[in-house]
Amino acid sequence: MQSQTDVWRSRVSSSLGIVLGAAVAAAAVAWTGTAEAQTKTLKMQSTWPASLTLQDNFKFFGERVEKLTGGTLKIETMAAGQIVPPFEILDATSKKVIDGGHGISYYWVGKNKAATLFSNSPAGIVGMDQMDFLGWIYEAGGLEMWWDFYQKDLKLNVVAFPILPSSPQALGWFRKPIQSVEDFKGMKCRQTGIVGEIYKKMGMNTVNMPGGEIVPSAERGVIDCAEWVGGVEDLRLGLPQVWKYHYTPGMHENASIGELIINKEVWDGLTPQQQEAIRSATTETLVRWWVKWQKQNADAIEEMQTKHGTQILRTPPEILTEFLKAWDEIAKEEMAVNPIFKRIYESQKAYASKVVPAKRFMFPPYSFAANYYFPPQSR
C-alpha cells in the first residue's frame, strides 16, 4: 500500500514550477463525461472571519475543486462561527458535524502540544523556512506523521493537507515602542498555542483568542498588544486602528502552514478522481497564495503608513535571539514528557540538519541583491 506522501508525489511534482501546470492538466483530463454525474456538496467551515484573505484562500480552494471535478464536487466554504465556534472545527469535523475545516493546527495544542509542529513551528523548529518545512511534509514523511497524529495519537476521524502559507509573520502590535525583552514585562498580549508559553517565559502575560475578538478586546483595554499575521491580514482585521507601533519580523511563525481537514469517512467516500482534485486544489491554492501575498503585503505596509500613520519598525535582534532561547527550553521540556512531540520534533530536526546548512551555503542572502538595487531606508 502506498504511503500518503508516495500518493502525493505520484501526482504533484516537488517542483513548484510544475505544480500549477499539473493542476491545470488535472482539470483538463481528470473528469470527462461528468454532465450526468451526481453533484456532491461538502459543508466546511474555517476559523477565519469572512473579511480576511485567509478566508479568500478557502474560497479559492472550493472554486478550484468544483472546476477540477467538472462540477460534481462542490465545497461550501463557510466563515468562522457559521456552524460551530472557530476553535471547535477539528472536533466538529471528526464527529461529522461538518465535513471539513480550514484552519491551523496550533489551535489544537490543548489536545497535545505536538499540534504546533504541523503549523507554526516556532523558529522553523531549528531554522527552517516555509519551503524547508514543506519539504519535510512532502519528501520526508511529514504528511504521514500528520495523519497519524490526528488518527492514531488523538483518535480523531480526520485527514489533513497543507493549504495556506502564512509566514513569515510580524512580531506584533504595541501601544508604545519596545527596545528589549524587558519591555514585555507587565504587557497582556494576544498570543496563541505554544507561542504563548514562549512569550510567557519572556515576561509577557498572554491570552488566546480568535482573530475576530482582537480589536474589540484592544478597544476595551483587555489586551495591550497582539500578534495576528502581518501585512494585509492585519490591515483587514483593523489592527492599525487601535495600535500605532508595528514590529516585524517575528521568530514565532517563520514556517507557518494552515491546514485543510476533512472527515475521514467523507474522504474515503470520495471517488479517486475527487480525491485527486482535492490534492491538486490544495497544492495549487498553497502556491498561488504564497505568491499573491507578496504584493498584497507590500501594498498593505504602504497603506498602513500613508493612511493610518503606523510606525513600522524592525524588531530588535535581542528580542529574536531571546525568543530562540526560550523556544529551545520549552521544546526540550516538552520532549522530556511528551513522546509524540519528541518523535515529530526529531524527524523535523533530522531533515533540517541536512537541508538548512546546505541551503545557507548555496543561497545568497536575500538582502545582498535587494540592498544593492533598493538601498534600505530607515522606517
Named regions from a protein language model:
Residues T5-V7, E36-T39:
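General helical secondary-structure elements
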Residues V29-A37:
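Sec/Tat signal peptide C-region and signal peptidase I cleavage site
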Residues G21-A22, Q38-F133, F149-R379:
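N-terminal secretory/targeting leader peptides
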Residues L20, V24-V29:
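Hydrophobic core
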Residues A140-M145:
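Core domains of carbohydrate- and sulfate-ester-processing enzymes
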Residues Q2-G21:
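Bacterial N-terminal signal peptides that target proteins for export
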Residues W136:
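A short, highly charged nucleic-acid-interacting micro-segment common to nuclease
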